[in-house]
Design a protein with these regions (language model features):
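Donor-sugar nucleotide-binding helix/loop cap in glycosyltransferases
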Residues: 1-314
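Catalytic cores of nucleic-acid endonucleases
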Residues: 393-437
Length: 480
């Protein structure tokens, strides 16, 4: 007969957080909302919420949704994902988290910032939940701890280690020895999981503390979903990966620099510390810290490891490709130092070399343009004939394939498009686990006049399929 494991009653405490109703479509929703609100002005709370509600109402099938649903979406986006900040006078404005996502369009970067500051207790939870966690002594950063479990498992065994939401919940997430007392380390948790597997020990999710009023227990899925949420967000951040049924989570060893940055994270919101030895804590005292919590989350920026970058193989491949042309066209042996920079721009640079390969002797004119020049485009390329092609690169990177036909231009970029006409191109690079493709728009000003593009007052562009054409990104592989 199999042994059954449960957390001892004296150590059991259910950690929970807001669960977005749009979690199955979270990447698409967050990108849409970030694009839509990033240029909103600082407004009184009621007016800001009305404008955000209008944005949410226009997403997907929400036009027929009840107002309560829209309000819930707004609360989840504001609280869990920190899309809104507040001034000292109570007015609201788009947060750095929202603005950065709208500007960069990299969902994996967004989720790394999100996980970097995610903790219990925190302002993403309701005040009474924060108070309960403080009274239990909880201080827990799940992302860092989960990565420490994988790190410890590698030290304990040479076998590949995987983790399930069930194991994480039962051996760590709901155990006060982990989340509050810190007497059970990540090494202990990894050892516990490995030994339970070896001894074929099963887990029971039927805790008396979770029994419902009707006498029934919540399902296993309901019990394990909170730990599962964090594991899923870590997949979206490219820290973990899944295989097959997505039941088992593995460390994404392709991103060790990224993983190490999280492991070295010392940031922690400590404004609740004064309450841990306080007998009575009021909702008002916790509520007073909400603005500081969202300011804390949004203070982090320019973390290099979080920005998408070429891995060593990609760098080698593109370096060989570009070197070929510089050596051939200019007799130079050294690779130009400005070749590598923005992830999307570098991939498009390689694409342009491959697009013109063997068809022109002018590849030396294909170059990245320094942002400091402010010319309104990222790359100078060539046509097969004698004309030049001026390319503005817009990139979106997500785990899943998402429906996105929106990007933002600057006034300078739009002015250049008007001046350069048919020589001006927008390359909208879309990257996800299924591949990399480019939607190419030539002469966006003309497309706008033909009603194939919509552009709002903030230069947010929404394009129709007829505005351009899709092409696969041309990629080189010289290193094999």
């Amino acid at each position: 007969m199999n042994q059954i494991y449960q957390i001892p009653d004296e150590y059991f405490f259910r950690l929970h957080h807001i669960r977005p109703r749009f979690k199955s479509n979270v990447e698409e929703v967050l990108l849409y909302v970030a694009n839509s609100i990033s240029d909103l002005n600082t407004l009184p709370e009621k007016e800001f919420n009305e404008q955000l509600n209008a944005v949410l109402r226009n997403f997907g099938k929400n036009q027929t949704a009840e107002q309560k649903t829209i309000d819930n979406w707004r609360t989840e986006i504001a609280a869990l994902f920190s899309f809104i900040q507040e001034t000292e006078t109570g007015k609201l404005f788009p947060s750095l988290m929202a603005e950065r996502l709208a500007k960069n369009q990299y969902l994996d970067e967004f989720f790394n910032y999100f996980l970097y500051t995610f903790q219990y207790p925190a302002g993403h939870n309701k005040n009474h939940a924060v108070i309960e966690q403080i009274k239990k002594g909880i201080q827990f950063q799940p992302c860092k701890f989960i990565l420490q479990i994988f790190q410890a498992a590698c030290e304990l065994s040479n076998k590949p280690f995987s983790l399930t939401a069930e194991e994480l919940t039962q051996c760590a997430y709901f155990d006060l020895r982990v989340t509050a007392e810190h007497s059970k380390t990540a090494h202990d948790v990894a050892k516990h999981i490995i030994e339970n597997r070896e001894n074929k020990i099963k887990y029971s999710h039927e805790y008396e503390q979770l029994k419902k009023k009707d006498g029934n227990y919540p399902s296993a899925g309901d019990v394990y979903r909170y730990a599962g949420d964090i594991l899923d967000y870590m997949v979206l951040a490219n820290l973990l990966k899944t295989k097959g049924t997505h039941y088992y989570y593995y460390l994404n060893t392709d991103n060790l620099d990224l993983i190490n940055r999280h492991l070295q994270n010392t940031a922690y919101f400590n404004q609740y510390n004064c309450f841990y030895h306080q007998k009575e804590i009021s909702n008002a005292e916790i509520r007073a810290l909400e603005r500081q919590w969202f300011d804390y989350v949004n203070q982090f920026d320019n973390i290099a490891e979080f920005s998408p970058s070429l891995n060593q193989a990609e760098q080698a491949d593109i370096a060989v490709l570009v070197q070929e042309y510089y050596a051939k066209m200019q007799g130079k042996e050294l690779l130009p130092t400005k070749i590598f920079g923005d992830y999307g721009e570098t991939l498009i640079l390689a694409h342009e070399y491959l697009r013109t390969k063997g068809q022109s002797n002018r590849q030396h004119l294909i170059n990245k343009i320094p942002t400091s020049l402010g010319v309104g485009y990222d790359l100078q390329s060539i046509e097969i004939e004698k004309h030049k092609r001026y390319i503005e690169v817009k990139s979106t990177r997500s785990k899943k394939a998402i429906n996105s036909n929106r990007f933002k231009l600057t006034p300078n970029e739009w002015d250049s498009a008007e001046t350069l006409g048919d020589c001006y191109f927008i390359y909208y690079l879309v990257m996800n686990e299924t591949g990399k493709n480019i939607f190419i728009i030539q002469n966006p000003v003309k497309k706008y006049r033909e009603n194939l593009l919509k552009i709002d007052s903030h230069l947010m562009v929404e394009f129709l399929p007829q505005a351009g054409k899709w092409q696969p990104l041309l990629e080189v592989s010289c290193s094999e």
